[in-house]
């Protein structure tokens, strides 16, 4: 980046100042931070921190001119921060809720839990071959347990002991952001930190993500273009970044990879990870031979917020909102699940009469506005712009899984199953080698299987309908050979409320996974003598894992002391299900 002229540098800095003063998108499309809970953090601040765009501008100076940054007290380590209690609004919304993890061992148990969840309209957070996490009101717990077999009535533990506080802590905190003490750009002996620490030190609202994407397109016009996929139900733009260097007058179809996140609004780590991978590819172009060659042969489309309306809603009203925000036949139950509304094997009959279901796929295929917009854009690119989509990564959370087609059923065998499995295993390996985080690999259809301790593995029923998924539509209807859904961190300690300290480590894991995908797509074309593994090691510095996968977690500060006063005595845990049994692997939530 040092080849920029002095005039170019001044232009970039002027652009950063301009963007900080004039929003790139209308206020209607990108509303500001919610007044609560963020404003509460600032009440006791003696000195306001610099604005985000000011810090971004400063980071450009550091990066381009090599000026060491001022000292910053980044979150983490031994630094102690003031404790703030969740405001009354969050207490009112979430204090009566609990997240329970059920351990499942038989098909009958799964079937009973599925039926009970449907009857009570419960919010299933995540499920694997061993457990299911469900959020419900505490006063509904007796009704749920009463519908379950005796073996399940005590086979559960609470995951998050203080849901309002955990929700509150997931929002950015101005009091926890490093302050500059008015020192500006004084030299420091501290080694230069990565510019990513500024944008990726916290989750960002849509009002920041949009201008940030525009800034990247303005700074790197040679290989970055800001595009629009379409409009949401509420009229917001669905922005995307096209990253690549397309040769002029090339008659061959342009091979293109789509990486998207935010289909489910509450899954903030997916949004941040899409942005992180985009930033990493953009800023590494010209510095790494593999990445430069990759972007000359492939375009990457990064869509961080496929569901902008729902994402804004999680910032302004309900942090745990999942669907989009369009109207349904029931005015008090808005929203369509954007991963259950796609046209291939749409299974709306499963939830068609229940718009209140969290997995409601609409009353017809492509009922979800944003999914319909993305499908139309993909069709237009294929038919009118000579684009060939070759890979699709759909980032979700949580449970740490790499899933491949098909989702709707296990009966059909994907024609390239062997290649799908091989690449999926490579993706999981890359993630494990980055930060020692383990991801399981399976077909998205598999649902639940019996414990591996048993000789025979039986396929269990699934907790929710899996027809109409984006994963299957891209694979079958578009012909994308490598279509995957990645369910990111964690495995339940925080669920959708993953602490901000996980943003960069998760981003690095998925960036390395994308590099494995790139190597798979490129093959040996022009890289016979290149050591990819050495190149990855050069580009990445592995972080220590924030959340360890081990089963040896120690109890800390009473975090394992659960309040079970709301559970009827007859349903309280007994010795039939040992929490420390092999395979249970419940990791306790830790204080930060």
Swiss-Prot record:
Residues 202-521 form the Peptidase M14 domain. Disulfide bonds join 333-356. Its cofactor is Zn(2+). This is Inactive metallocarboxypeptidase ECM14. Residues 559-575 have a biased composition (Basic and acidic residues). Inactive carboxypeptidase that may play a role in cell wall organization and biogenesis. Substrate binds at residues 264-267, 322, 339-340, 397-398. It is found in: Vacuole; Secreted. Keywords: Cell wall biogenesis/degradation, Disulfide bond, Glycoprotein, Metal-binding, Secreted, Signal, Vacuole, Zinc. Residues 548-558 have a biased composition (Acidic residues). Binds 1 zinc ion per subunit. Glycans are attached at residue 349. Zn(2+) binds at residues 264, 267, 396. Residues 1-21 form the signal peptide. The lineage of its organism: Eukaryota, Fungi, Dikarya, Ascomycota, Pezizomycotina. GO terms for molecular function: zinc ion binding. Residues 170-179 have a biased composition (Polar residues). Pfam families: Peptidase_M14. Residues 22-174 form a propeptide. Residues 170-191, 542-592 are annotated as: Disordered. CDD domains: M14_CP_A-B_like. InterPro entries: Peptidase_M14. It comes from Ajellomyces dermatitidis (strain ER-3 / ATCC MYA-2586) (Blastomyces dermatitidis).
């Amino acid at each position: 980046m040092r080849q920029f002229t002095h005039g170019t540098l001044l232009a970039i800095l002027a652009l950063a100042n301009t963007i900080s003063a004039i929003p790139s998108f209308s206020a209607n499309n990108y509303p500001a931070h919610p007044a609560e809970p963020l404003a509460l953090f600032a009440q006791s601040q003696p000195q306001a921190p610099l604005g985000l765009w000011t810090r971004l501008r400063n980071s450009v100076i550091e990066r381009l001119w090599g000026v060491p940054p001022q000292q910053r007290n980044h979150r983490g380590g031994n630094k102690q921060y003031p404790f703030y209690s969740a405001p009354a609004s969050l207490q009112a919304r979430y204090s009566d809720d609990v997240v329970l993890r059920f351990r499942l061992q038989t098909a009958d148990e799964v079937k009973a839990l599925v039926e009970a969840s449907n009857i009570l309209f419960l919010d299933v957070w995540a499920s694997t071959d061993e457990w299911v996490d469900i959020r419900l009101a505490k006063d509904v717990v007796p009704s749920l347990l009463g519908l379950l077999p005796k073996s399940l009535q005590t086979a559960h533990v609470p995951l998050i002991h203080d849901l309002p506080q955990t929700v509150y802590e997931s929002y950015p905190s101005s009091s926890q952001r490093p302050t500059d003490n008015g020192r500006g750009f004084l030299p420091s002996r501290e080694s230069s930190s990565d510019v990513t620490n500024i944008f990726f030190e916290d989750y960002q609202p849509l009002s920041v993500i949009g201008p940030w994407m525009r800034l990247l397109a303005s700074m790197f016009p040679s290989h970055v273009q800001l595009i629009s996929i379409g409009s949401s139900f509420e009229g917001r733009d669905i922005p995307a970044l096209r990253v690549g260097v397309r040769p002029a007058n090339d008659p061959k179809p342009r091979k293109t990879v789509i990486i998207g996140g935010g289909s489910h609004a509450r899954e903030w780590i997916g949004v941040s990870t899409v942005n992180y991978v985009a930033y990493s590819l953009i800023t590494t172009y010209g510095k790494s031979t593999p990445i430069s060659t990759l972007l000359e042969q492939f375009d990457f489309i990064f869509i961080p917020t496929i569901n902008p309306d729902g994402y804004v809603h999680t910032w302004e009203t309900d942090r745990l909102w999942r669907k989009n925000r369009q109207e349904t036949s029931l005015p008090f139950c808005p929203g369509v699940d954007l991963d259950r509304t796609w046209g291939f094997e749409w299974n709306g009959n499963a939830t068609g009469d229940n718009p209140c279901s969290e997995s409601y796929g609409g009353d017809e295929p492509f009922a979800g506005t944003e999914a319909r917009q993305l499908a139309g854009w993909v069709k237009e690119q294929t038919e009118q712009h000579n684009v060939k989509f070759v890979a699709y990564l759909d980032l979700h959370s949580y449970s740490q899984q790499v899933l491949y087609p098909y989702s709707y059923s296990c009966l059909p065998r994907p024609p390239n199953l062997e290649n799908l499995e091989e690449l999926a295993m490579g993706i999981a390996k890359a993630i494990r080698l980055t930060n020692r985080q383990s991801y399981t690999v399976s077909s998205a259809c598999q649902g639940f299987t019996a414990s591996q301790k048993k000789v025979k593995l039986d396929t269990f029923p699934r907790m929710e309908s899996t027809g109409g998924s984006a994963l299957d539509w891209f694979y079958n209807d578009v012909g994308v050979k490598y279509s995957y859904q990645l369910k990111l961190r964690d495995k339940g300690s925080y669920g959708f409320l993953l602490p901000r300290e996980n943003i960069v480590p998760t981003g690095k894991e998925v960036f390395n996974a994308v590099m494995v995908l790139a190597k798979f797509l490129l093959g040996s074309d022009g890289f016979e003598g290149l050591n990819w593994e050495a190149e990855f090691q050069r580009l990445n510095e592995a972080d220590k894992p924030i959340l360890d996968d081990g089963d040896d977690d120690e109890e800390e500060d009473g975090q394992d002391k659960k309040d079970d006063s709301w559970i009827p005595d007859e349903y309280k845990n007994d010795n039939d299900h040992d929490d420390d049994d092999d395979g249970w692997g419940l990791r306790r939530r830790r204080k930060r």
